[in-house]
Amino acid sequence: MHRTAIFLTYRSCMRNFSTLSKTLTVSSGKVIRNGPFRRVIREKNQITKAPSVKAFKENSNSGIIKVHDPIATTILNEPTVIIERQIEFMNVFLGFEQANRYAIMDVNGNKIASMMERDFSITKAIMRQFYRLHRPFLVDVFDNWGNVIMTIKRPFSFINSHIKTIIPPSAYVDNGSDSTHYHDGKEGTTVGETIQNWHLWRRRYELFQKDGVEGSTFDQFGKIDAPFLSFDFPVTDADGKIMASVDRNWVGLGREMFTDTGVYVVRFDSQRCFDNIYPTEMLSSQVLTLDQRAVLLANAVSIDFDYFSRHSRQTGGFLSFGGGYDE
């Protein structure tokens, strides 16, 4: 009888604990997991189903970014773009952390845009020396005429980086000076975000798109799960099929050893960019929307900061085989 009473009491406690856990999961309203992918909720007490991803041609006008927007006509309409981080000589020879600069090119090597980390004050320059890999930053994407067409934002990250993709409301560059001037007002429209998913040796990210301009949810449309010291970062859908990728190209022993530079190939279109790279059966039939392409472009910057820059080194001038400084 004594053992029976203890067993019944144990079952009752476990049943109450299970009920309490379900109640807390629903009421917290932070993250709802549905199968392999998830949806991040910005409103409480809201339960949603797993997101669906439509083809780019069918969904090009339904997202936040439209086909005629500058970021689309300049970069995102390209099936493949190449990002090259500019050489940072002070970082290489003195270990001084400089603001990152990038050139964006098409597959023919023509420069179509650029990216530059905001560097407006001595305070931020000092912060870069202390925070290095974990530092917060704002990276602006410019067209060839100096207009800001997108902003990549990352707050301070102690472990996992969290990148936001933002379309600015309005901005212009004063061509008569070296500084960029921004109109007062709200920060801009968030298109999506990427969240690094910490793992002891693998390189993982989750990619989200915002559910409309006024939406409060972020739907996961892809994930990256690259192996240890990988140079290739394929983006897979919910079925594990490859829909896009960010790959770091080896640029030669001399440049890798004596400069702080990096070249990345961003492939947006699974139907046009992976000939002789992956077997057809490994490719997804889904094609990234403009919003999703903008998020992937920002994720390429996150990959560069997290794994291939020298930000976690105290001194420059050393070769980074795989760049896994934070592992």
From Swiss-Prot:
The organism's place on the tree of life at top rank: Eukaryota
Q: Which UniProt keywords apply?
A: Mitochondrion
Family under the similarity heading: Belongs to the phospholipid scramblase family.
Which GO CC terms are listed, alphabetically? mitochondrion; plasma membrane
InterPro entries with a match to the protein in the record = Scramblase (IPR005552)
Example GO biological process: cellular response to heat
Q: Where in the cell is it found?
A: Mitochondrion
Can you say what this protein is called?
Altered inheritance rate of mitochondria protein 25
Citing just one GO molecular function, the answer is: phospholipid scramblase activity
Q: Quote the Pfam families the UniProt record gives.
A: Scramblase
